[in-house]
């Protein structure tokens, strides 16, 4: 019993990985371990070996590699020496961050090159077929449909975890949640190729969110590679610090904005950030952005290192004081627009999930939904068609370049003569003006982007929202230029309106409203290369965040809820009632616990009562003094070891030795560990296996041999082994009749094959009734916790702790549950689910509304079934009866109330 318990300790210390479940759009994560439970139940029933019994293969220390004679050993020893030299001269962190920045810069530049080639190919096909409108439409529509379909299919086949942005998942990973196969090599390949095809199709999709995921995968893979040489990267906790730096690198190399990238990654992935990781993010992001722009110069895309969207606003007086109300209006309107975008995106997913018939049909045809969405958007953006009224022929980069133009498009309602006319004229079609084109562009791109981001391909939403905000700001700027055609007059001079500055303000405001970040202002400054409009940008971004945060969660928090990831909502601001809510108002008082002097029956009942990951260990049910906590896996291992088939066979063997005394057994009674049983099979003389009649298979003692006996001798122990092997054998009369029916020729042509009988074949020694009786006896024995690793100091709170302080502690420490004690006595428990639902339901129009104690640790249905033969099987049974814990996963009702 000590070995499984000790092994279960090691297993229990590892966090549970959330499984990814494919859905039509985003997918969801769940901690449902039904498959593992079924495998474990089958193993226990068959008496198979425990998976944790296999000893880990020891790794050769680096000091002993020089004694190896193979070529691989010498190469590895050389690499270890080079690694030690670099570490001693430079440092491990610097090497890691330089490699991470270099790899991400190369990946970003290569992807941008491939995306630009795909977009140019689409424009080339469209221009080449302009003489035939039907062929031009087919080419315009078919090209993105093929790319999106390939991206969706490739991602679903290789790694479904690569779907979507990646920032919501990284936010939960940095909090301590383990997502299965989310940072693997195949997910990296699927993300890179799928994102390249998705952005190359021309759909309104973004790159920033997926690049955070790509950078995190690079950091994880690089950590595994460097851990081969030893050092700090063998420590799993060290990887979290590098993942935080990788998130900054992902944004930095995407927009060549290292400062904004670091700040943005901190805002969207962390509630509390360790300042010791600050320099890592800045160094890696700066190096990555530098290499990214150097590669653009090397490829002759740029003449020198410059901003990604260079602007030329006047620096002496970029704006006047009288324009600040207009900038404030942009911020407030962007706040409402950002909240509406998040609501529309979540509503699309909810509507599709509620339509069960359509959802089931599209789930069977997984590529149909992305193809239909792409077909719809491509049809509406067809340049000779409706796309001419919304600048459909421009890509996102060309759209931003024209929107940030510092020249005025409209003066007194007339379109100015613009140079170059290739891109700017897209905003002034023959039968419309600039205002109508901008309004149609904003409205159409708004719902198109909300719909396109639900496609199951690697994609983000930052860049589409950024473009929509720039268009809205440009609309306000052009309106201001039309209202003040001669500019704004002051005492001494006149200042002309610059619509491009309004576009910069609108882009930062709407992006900040959707993501609930202020760092978008810094990203805009680095993208444009000018900081002239810092005051209007900051005013608009702060106002937009104030409005959006009071209406809707951020886009990333909304996706976290859609995907059923563990999360802890923010308390928000201005809710002073939450300071008066105490832990005693929201805690669960019926805490599942085990006493120090409990029996195995009490352990079984405690496991059936709760799905929690840990159980409280108290001194006695009367005193309820908290001694510590024990992992659920350890309790399961204790119960499984107590009711294991090996113990059952050992008990049966001892009982047989005590009640039966054959001569051979008296001299040397066999033990369960050393007894060897044989199984006899009949084969033809030619070597082909023979299939005798069914009664012949079940002859008890005629074909059994034992060590030290002749093949014809009869030994009682061998007979017992074969009777257990062939349980339910027919009467001896039926066996004798079947023997007489065999011909003598077949008997002569047979030979005997002797093989070892497995332990699982010996379970037939005891009938189901005897097994149940034996288990009832074992369940009444006391539990010995000396072989279990007990946490003597689990996290505890007092009942007077406020809800605000509890939220801060949970966010800062990353804990998922805390016991509530009073002078050492256990009186309740608060989990992540209770805290989340208390925060979401704590404020009403009348004041504080305290939710009743929630049911995450209440009794689950424990109806017994007559078909169960063992108590261990009942423990690991179907999840509807005694499911394994889904700690931290929101309930199904959360998805309905989004």
UniProtKB/Swiss-Prot annotation:
Lineage: superkingdom: Eukaryota
Location of the region described as Modulates channel gating by both voltage and cell volume in the Swiss-Prot/TrEMBL record: 39-52
GO biological process, alphabetically ordered: acinar cell differentiation; cell differentiation involved in salivary gland development; phagocytosis, engulfment; regulation of aldosterone biosynthetic process; regulation of resting membrane potential; retina development in camera-type eye; stabilization of membrane potential
Keyword Heme: no
Extent of Basic residues compositional bias: 647-658
Record field: intramembrane: 167-174, 242-254, 258-266, 500-514, 515-516, 517-528, 529-533
UniProt site positions, description: Protopore gate: 208
Disordered: region residues: 647-675, 726-766, 856-898
Region spans: Essential for channel gating by both voltage and cell volume: 19-37
Entry GO CC: astrocyte end-foot; axon; basolateral plasma membrane; chloride channel complex; dendritic spine membrane; myelin sheath; plasma membrane; postsynaptic membrane
Compartments in which it is found: Cell membrane; Basolateral cell membrane; Cell projection, Dendritic spine membrane; Cell projection, Axon
GO MF terms held by the record: chloride channel regulator activity; voltage-gated chloride channel activity
Bilayer topology: Multi-pass membrane protein
Catalytic activity: chloride(in) = chloride(out); thiocyanate(in) = thiocyanate(out); bromide(in) = bromide(out); nitrate(in) = nitrate(out)
Phosphoserine modifications at: 710, 758
Tissue distribution: Ubiquitously expressed.
Marked site (Couples extracellular acidification to the channel closure) residue numbers: 533
Spans through the membrane: 91-124, 133-158, 183-201, 208-226, 278-298, 324-352, 361-380, 432-452, 460-483, 534-551
Function statement: Voltage-gated and osmosensitive chloride channel. Forms a homodimeric channel where each subunit has its own ion conduction pathway. Conducts double-barreled currents controlled by two types of gates, two fast glutamate gates that control each subunit independently and a slow common gate that opens and shuts off both subunits simultaneously. Displays inward rectification currents activated upon membrane hyperpolarization and extracellular hypotonicity. Contributes to chloride conductance involved in neuron excitability.
Family of the protein in this entry: Belongs to the chloride channel (TC 2.A.49) family. ClC-2/CLCN2 subfamily.
UniProt protein name: Chloride channel protein 2
Species whose genome carries this gene: Oryctolagus cuniculus
């Amino acid at each position: 019993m000590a070995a499984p318990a000790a092994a279960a300790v090691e297993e229990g210390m590892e966090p549970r990985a959330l499984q990814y479940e494919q859905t039509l759009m985003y997918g969801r994560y769940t901690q449902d371990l039904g498959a593992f439970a079924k495998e474990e139940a089958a193993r226990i029933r068959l008496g198979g070996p425990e998976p944790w019994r296999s000893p880990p293969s020891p790794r050769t220390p680096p000091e002993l590699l020089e004694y190896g004679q193979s070529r691989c050993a010498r190469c590895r020893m050389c690499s270890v020496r080079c690694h030690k030299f670099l570490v001693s001269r430079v440092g491990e962190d610097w090497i890691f961050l330089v490699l991470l920045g270099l790899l991400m810069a190369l990946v970003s530049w290569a992807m941008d090159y491939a995306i630009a080639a795909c977009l140019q190919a689409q424009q080339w096909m469209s221009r080449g077929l302009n003489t035939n409108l039907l062929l031009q439409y087919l080419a315009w529509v078919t090209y993105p449909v093929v790319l999106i379909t390939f991206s969706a299919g490739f991602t679903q086949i290789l790694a479904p975890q690569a779907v979507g942005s990646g920032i919501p998942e990284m936010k939960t990973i940095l909090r301590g949640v383990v997502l299965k196969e989310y940072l693997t090599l195949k997910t990296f390949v699927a993300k890179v190729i799928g994102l390249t095809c998705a952005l190359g199709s021309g759909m309104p999709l973004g790159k920033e969110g997926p690049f955070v995921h790509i950078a995190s995968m690079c950091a994880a893979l690089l950590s595994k590679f460097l851990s081969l040489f030893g050092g700090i990267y063998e420590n799993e906790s060290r990887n979290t610090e590098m993942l935080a730096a990788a998130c900054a690198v992902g944004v930095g190399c995407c927009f060549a904005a290292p400062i904004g990238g670091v700040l943005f990654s901190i805002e969207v992935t962390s509630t509390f950030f360790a300042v010791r990781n600050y320099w890592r993010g800045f160094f890696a992001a700066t190096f990555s952005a530098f290499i990214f722009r150097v590669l653009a110069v090397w490829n002759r895309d740029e003449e020198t290192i410059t901003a990604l969207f260079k602007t030329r606003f006047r620096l002496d007086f970029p704006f006047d004081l009288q324009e600040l109300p207009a900038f404030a209006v942009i911020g407030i309107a962007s706040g409402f627009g950002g909240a509406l975008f998040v609501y529309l995106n979540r509503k699309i997913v909810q509507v599709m999930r509620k339509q069960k018939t359509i959802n089931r049909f599209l789930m069977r045809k997984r590529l149909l939904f992305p193809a239909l969405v792409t077909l719809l958007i491509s049809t509406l953006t067809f340049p000779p068609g409706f796309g001419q009224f919304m600048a459909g022929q421009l890509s996102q980069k060309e759209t931003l370049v024209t929107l940030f133009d510092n020249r005025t498009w409209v003066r007194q309602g007339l379109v100015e003569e613009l140079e170059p006319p290739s891109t700017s004229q897209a905003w002034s079609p023959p039968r419309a003006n600039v205002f109508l084109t901008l309004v149609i562009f904003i409205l159409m791109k708004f719902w198109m982007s909300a719909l396109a981001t639900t496609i199951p391909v690697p994609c983000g939403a930052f860049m589409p929202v950024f473009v929509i905000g720039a268009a809205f700001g440009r609309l306000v700027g052009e309106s201001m230029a039309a209202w003040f055609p001669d500019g704004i007059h002051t005492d001494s001079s006149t200042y002309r309106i610059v619509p491009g500055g309004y576009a910069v303000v609108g882009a930062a405001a709407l992006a900040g409203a959707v993501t609930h970040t202020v760092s978008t202002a810094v990203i805009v400054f680095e993208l444009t290369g000018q900081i002239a409009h810092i005051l209007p940008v900051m005013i608009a971004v702060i106002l937009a965040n104030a409005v959006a945060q009071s209406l809707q969660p951020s886009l990333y928090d909304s996706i976290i809820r859609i995907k059923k990831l563990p999360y802890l909502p923010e308390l928000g601001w201005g809710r002073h009632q939450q300071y008066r809510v105490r832990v005693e108002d929201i805690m669960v008082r019926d805490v599942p616990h085990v006493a120090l002097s409990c029996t195995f029956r009490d352990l079984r009942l405690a496991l059936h009562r709760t799905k929690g990951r840990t159980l409280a260990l108290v001194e006695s049910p009367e005193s309820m003094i908290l001694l510590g906590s024990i992992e659920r896996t350890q309790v399961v291992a204790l119960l499984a070891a107590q009711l294991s088939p090996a113990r059952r066979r050992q008990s049966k063997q001892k009982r047989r030795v005590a009640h039966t005394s054959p001569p051979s057994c008296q001299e040397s009674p066999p033990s369960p560990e050393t007894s060897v049983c044989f199984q006899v099979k009949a084969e033809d003389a030619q070597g082909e296996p023979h299939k005798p009649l069914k009664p012949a298979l079940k002859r008890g003692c005629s074909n059994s041999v034992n060590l030290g006996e002749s093949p014809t001798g009869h030994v009682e122990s061998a007979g017992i082994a074969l009777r257990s092997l062939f349980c339910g054998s027919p009467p001896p009369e039926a066996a004798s009749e079947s023997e007489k029916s065999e011909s003598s020729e077949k008997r002569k042509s047979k030979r005997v094959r002797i093989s070892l009988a497995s332990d699982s074949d010996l379970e037939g020694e005891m009938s189901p009734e005897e097994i149940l009786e034996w288990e009832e006896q074992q369940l009444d024995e006391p539990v010995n916790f000396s072989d279990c690793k007990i946490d003597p100091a689990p996290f505890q709170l007092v009942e007077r702790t406020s809800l605000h302080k509890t939220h801060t502690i949970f966010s800062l420490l990353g804990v998922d549950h805390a016991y509530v004690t009073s002078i050492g006595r256990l009186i309740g428990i608060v989990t992540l689910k209770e805290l989340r639902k208390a925060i979401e339901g704590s404020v009403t129009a009348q004041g504080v509304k305290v939710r009743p104690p929630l049911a995450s640790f209440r009794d689950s249905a424990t109806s017994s079934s007559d078909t169960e033969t063992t108590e261990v099987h009942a423990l690991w049974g179907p999840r509807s009866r005694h499911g394994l814990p889904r700690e931290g996963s929101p309930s199904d009702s959360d998805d309905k109330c989004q």
